[in-house]
Structure formats: C-alpha cells, structure tokens
Amino acid sequence: RALPSLEAVRDNCYRRRVALRNCGWGWVSIAWDGSHIYIDFSECADITRDEREDIVRRVRRVFDTDAQAAAIHEHLIADSVLGTWVVEAPGLRVPGAWDGYETAVRAILGQQVSVARATELATKLVQEYGAGHFPAAADLARREVAELGMPGRRGRAISTVARGLDEGRLSLSAAPDFAEKWLAIEGIGPWTVNYLRLRVLKDPDAFPHNDWVVLKRL
C-alpha cells in the first residue's frame, strides 16, 4: 500500500515524507520497539514546534494510540464471533489516516479493485499530478483523473471530491450531514463513507458492513 515517494515500511519502522515550512520537505521515522513508539525528526531540518506537534498528532491518529485497548478487549472477547479472533490477535487497533484528503482519494481509487491495483493507480497519480508529492485538492479538481486508467465515473468522483474540499463544500470532520453530503456524489457509496468514518473520522461505530473481505470472513 505504501507510495514509494511518500512513505516506506521496513524493520518495524514507518517513514513518511512531510512538508516543512522552512526547508520544503523532510522525513520522519516512527519505530516500535515492542513497548514504545519513537519518532525520529533527525531528517527534518529547521522543523518548528507547531510542525512537530502536528506530526505527533498524526502519529497518534495513524497508530490509534488513544484507543482504550483493555476496555475494547473486554467487550469484544465476549462476542460469540469476534471473541475467537481477539484471542488469536489481541490488541489490534484501527489504523488511522495520516492525511484525510489523501485517504479519501485512495479510498475511491480502491473501489472494486485489488490492493495492488489501487496502489499502482495512487502511485501514478502522485507521479503524474504531484511530481512526487500527493497532489493538492485544487490540482486534482481540474484534472481528468480517469486518464490514469480507471472508469470515468470513478475519476469524476475524485475530481468532485477534490473540488468540494478545495471550495469548502465538503469536509472531513465529524458532522451530522457527513454521510449525506458524501453519498450525494456520483461514485461514492456506503462502503467509501464507512471507510472514511473508520479511518479518517475515527468513528468507533463505523463498520464497512458491505466490504467483500469482511463478508467473506464473517
């Protein structure tokens, strides 16, 4: 799933490219030693305090460190279906989004295709429109994204989402009309909305009930 120019995973370490005010770009490394998460800022020259705090917030969201693991375990282990899986893999957390907009675009790219194909499309999108960075919403809003090799409806959905976020008509924050606004976009269905609620909004009640893999496992 990793985008080569933006992120990498190796030896229990996640590396992410980040935009920095004073030097353009840098890399942060997040490592797990079995009991603690460590963030290495050594490749972020002249990083500001605000930028450092923002990165820490993103790391907490991505790795779901605020989840009350013990309480979650206690509730799920009592379930007749989930209990067995909880015993097999205790302490699993829901991975969050480093960037909500990026995750939304990648969710649409991933509709009805394999993970490998979705990653291939996302990599092409970064190369063609972002020059190695994930393209800004304003840039994607005026692109014919389908030219990368996907159904036109899906490409138009990405452009519509990018335009809506850029113009402020859409948001990626919890709001009573979140699902209503996103479902009104052609090419956005319940799976995408529930995925965003789960990964971006960190909604504990979100569940992609119509996901093919989930249905197969259940």
Task: Give residue ranges: language-model regions.
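HhH-family (HhH-GPD) DNA N-glycosylase catalytic core used in base-excision repair
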Residues: 1-218
